[in-house]
Structures are given as C-alpha cells and as structure tokens.
Regions:
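N-terminal, positively charged/glycine-rich alpha-helical extensions of SAM-dependent methyltransferases
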Residues: 1-34
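A short glycine-rich, Lys/Arg-flanked "PGG" loop and its adjoining helix->strand segment in the class I
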Residues: 147-159
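A generic alpha-to-beta junction signature in SAM-dependent methyltransferases
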Residues: 58-60, 84, 157
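Conserved beta-strand signature within the Rossmann-like core of class I S-adenosyl-L-methionine
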Residues: 160-167
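A short SAM/SAH-binding and catalytic strip from SAM-dependent methyltransferases
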Residues: 131-144
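Class I SAM-dependent methyltransferase SAM/SAH-binding core
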Residues: 65-121
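Conserved alpha-helix/loop element of class I SAM-dependent methyltransferases that forms part
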Residues: 42-62, 75
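A short acidic, Gly/Pro-enriched loop at the edge of an enzyme's catalytic core
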Residues: 120-132
Length: 168
C-alpha cells in the first residue's frame, strides 16, 4: 500500500493525498511548516510583504461576508480577522489544517466560521460572499481542479463582489 492512501479520507482529493500529504495532511509536517522562518524561506523572504498587500485589499465594508478558500500556513487568517470586523468563512478539506486555523483564531473566533469542504465543490449558496480570498492555492492544483475552483468562486461571489488572489 502506498503511504499517501492513508490520507485519502474525509473527502481529501486523490491529488492532494498523493502529492502533498507530506506538506498539508501529516500532523508532523503541519507543525513544521507553520513556523514563520520556514514559510518565509519558501516564499523567498516575501511573506510579510505579500501578507500586507493581501490585507490592504481585503473587504472592509461593514456587514460584508468574506470567504477564505483553504487554510494556509502563517498568520493570514488571524491577521485578516484583526484587519476587518467582518465575518470570515474559512474552508479546507483537511481536518488538520482546520484544527491549526482554529487554534490561531481563538481570540477572534466569534467572527470566524470554519467548514470542512473541498474548494472544488463548495457547500455555500450562490452569491453568498462579498469577497473570496485565495492565498497561495492555485499553484497547488492540477488544471481540472483549478477550473472547478474558478467555477465555484464565480458561483459563490456576489455580483459586484471581488476575488482577491495572492499567488506566485
């Protein structure tokens, strides 16, 4: 049995388990990669700059609903919750990533709604969000999954809403 098959549970896509189990699904790697020096090294020293640019474009309109597609290592989610007073919905297919996000947002959890779901097939209503935020997601996706995510974003973002993509 291949090692990655141990991670094929709870709706985890095959490509994620096969190619990225070591980075996003294994508890020891989740702990390892969520250290600022590691994240900054992966991003060639640009993490803080990219985070600041992302936060500068986050929706601040009172009453807006934001969706952050997938958890990410680092401080995006807690920073986003401190930056805006809006409700932030955060979804990820990986339970370990959601647990990590929950631990980082305890002090602002009244505005953070966590949900376990695949970004390729969101369980949200049409036109549910004023802004959808993607922080380093697309480079991890195979082309067909990427297209499904594009389609889902178009479905859940309100007319006149925005999509904020930070990528390298």
């Amino acid at each position: 049995m291949r090692l990655y098959k141990r991670f094929l549970k709870g709706g985890v896509p095959e490509y994620l388990a096969r190619y990225y189990w070591w980075a996003y699904l294994w508890e020891k790697s989740i702990w390892f990669f969520d250290h600022q020096p590691v994240i900054n090294a992966i991003l060639f020293g640009q993490y803080d700059r990219l985070l600041e640019k992302t936060l500068a474009h986050a929706e601040e309109k009172p009453g807006a609903k934001l969706l952050q597609l997938t958890c990410v290592y680092g401080k995006l989610t807690p920073s986003l919750l401190r930056h805006t007073s809006n409700e932030v919905h955060l979804c990820d297919v990986a339970a370990g990533q959601l647990n990590l996000a929950r631990s980082k947002t305890l002090d602002v959890s009244d505005r953070c709604r966590l949900a376990r779901m695949n970004a390729e097939s969101l369980g949200y209503a049409n036109d549910a969000f004023d802004q959808v935020i993607l922080f380093f997601l697309f480079h991890e996706l195979p082309p067909d999954a990427r297209q499904h995510v594009y389609d889902e974003i178009a479905r859940v973002v309100k007319a006149g809403g925005s999509v904020l993509i930070t990528e390298y």
